[in-house]
């Protein structure tokens, strides 16, 4: 079988490897499609804070079950599936309190793990699998994992409320995670949704998919422009870029008493105006991956007629063009790039 390996900075190659053997409690799946995530881009460029090259990429994976260990129940050969790629220890404080996404001994399939989803076959514990609804295309199914990340972030931002009813929110970045955050914010009843991006075509797509207002992220007067347009500060800002410029913009937009959610994966450290954060009671909240309930919400969102997977998945490459797929994703002109394995 073949597995894609990020062998060095900006280089991925298909390698011949042995098919993984099945262990107790595991499922062996064959890959259909895998998404190139923003974290894959950071990692292959040598910028990811926790995933050095070489590594085995691929965690936004959709596959078909080919084998099951005898003790696995609830699944069958032929089921189409996606996975929760985080692999908790199930024994630490956080795992025992329902926060297995924050496991103190966490491993992550496709991010520094011995296997990744950019391979013909792979194995994982059955506890990490979710069945894909028959009505979903492979492209729509490939959105379940990445959508679960903003779903988790949006739910963390409720702060005692049941949803976003009455809230004005801003989403910084109109890439995959930004657009999926748009869907999550709409699903949880945000009143007004403002989005920003450097690229006009991405801003136009955000508007097409339901953003109330869009703004050029390069504007030097962005925070004041948005404040003037919405008539108030922003209740919740979802930073899906997580660079110095967007973090600074987010804090300005949330001033005063707002919340800033860090949704994107930062490639490096940033600085924040701590006196303003303290004095103006601005809340900055990180958000790490997801929980099983977030997958259920994601499936519900994708099931809605308003969800347009074809508008988000803008490029699909066969596995023998994986280098081109990564180069295309790195260039930043596309939204979501997929690699098809079978």
Residue ranges and their predicted role:
Residues 136-219:
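Mid-domain Rossmann-like dinucleotide-binding core that forms the NAD(H)/NADP(H) cofactor-binding site
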Residues 20-34, 47-93, 133-135:
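Glycine-rich beta-strand-centered segment in the early N-terminal region that forms part
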Residues 89-172:
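NAD(P)H dinucleotide-binding glycine-rich loop of Rossmann-like/cofactor-binding domains
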Residues 1, 166-167, 191, 258, ...:
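Nucleotide donor/acceptor-binding cores
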